[in-house]
């Protein structure tokens, strides 16, 4: 028998590293989760490029008899068995996941989607179009289209206590999941706020894609705050109480 309210757990807390070269030697530095985000401790890099390896917060929601996964994360979490082992701690197998949500389509949120081929994937219709322009031509097919894509716009209720809302800014189709729990509303907001200071100080996101203004991104943060969440889970920082 399912409980009246949903349960929310962070399966993996975000991590982020930068790889580069300083004085001819490789450098690997941990950057997140730290707020505010420090600059990389890397001077000279490959043609001025720093290579990043990291993943987002991956969230498990259990509601109304359904197991929902928000932002499965980078491909290594699936490839090296991290996701199956973490799910097992909750008595679940990958096959027990009923629904996948992508708050947006950047690689660090979506690459392990492949583990749920054919399962329902909720994504904003504008984000689905945006995904076709990312990375390389076949990318959307490899990580998005192999699931049963459920495109939507506006607001979408997917289970008794889980609804999706538009929170554009970081990308043109960014969404957030609002979850009613016994403690109150939990907001899983993806990169609408990269770190908690973005939310608390109404800061513009680090990435604002075409056709979206910084003002739109800030309006999305105000929109989320208007729901009065008791817990906010940003994309790349630890969960916090506003």
Language model segments and positions:
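Zn-dependent metallo-beta-lactamase
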Residues: 1-66, 225-226
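Core dinuclear metal-dependent hydrolase active-site scaffold
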Residues: 10, 58-62, 68, 154-182
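Pre-active-site segment of Zn-dependent metallo-hydrolases
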Residues: 39-58, 62-99
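Metallo-beta-lactamase
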Residues: 75, 81, 88-92, 96-108, 115, 166, 172-242, ...
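Metal-dependent catalytic neighborhoods of phosphoester/phosphodiester hydrolases
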Residues: 111-117
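Short hydrophobic/aromatic-enriched beta-strand-loop microsegments
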Residues: 120-125, 187-190
């Amino acid at each position: 028998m399912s409980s009246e309210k949903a349960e929310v757990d962070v399966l993996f807390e975000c991590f982020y590293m930068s790889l580069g070269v300083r004085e001819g030697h490789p450098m690997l530095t941990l950057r997140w989760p730290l707020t505010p985000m420090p600059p990389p401790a890397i001077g000279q890099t490959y043609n001025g490029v720093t290579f990043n390896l990291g993943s987002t917060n991956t969230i498990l929601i259990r509601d109304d008899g359904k197991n929902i996964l928000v932002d499965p994360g980078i491909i290594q979490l699936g490839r090296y068995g991290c996701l199956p082992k973490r799910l097992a701690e909750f008595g679940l197998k990958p096959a027990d996941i009923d629904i996948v949500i992508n708050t947006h389509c950047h690689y660090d949120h979506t690459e392990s989607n492949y583990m749920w081929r054919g399962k329902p994937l909720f994504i904003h219709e504008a984000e689905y179009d945006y995904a076709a322009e990312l990375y390389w031509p076949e990318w959307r097919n490899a990580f998005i289209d192999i699931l049963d894509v459920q495109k939507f716009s506006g607001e979408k209720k997917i289970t008794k206590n889980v609804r999706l809302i538009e929170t554009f800014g970081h990308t043109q189709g960014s969404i957030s999941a609002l979850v009613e729990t016994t403690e109150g509303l939990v907001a899983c907001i993806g990169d609408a706020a990269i770190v908690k200071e973005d939310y608390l100080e109404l800061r513009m996101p680090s990435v604002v894609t075409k056709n979206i203004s910084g003002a739109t991104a800030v309006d999305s943060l105000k929109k989320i705050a208007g729901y009065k969440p008791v817990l906010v889970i940003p994309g790349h920082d630890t969960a916090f109480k506003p």
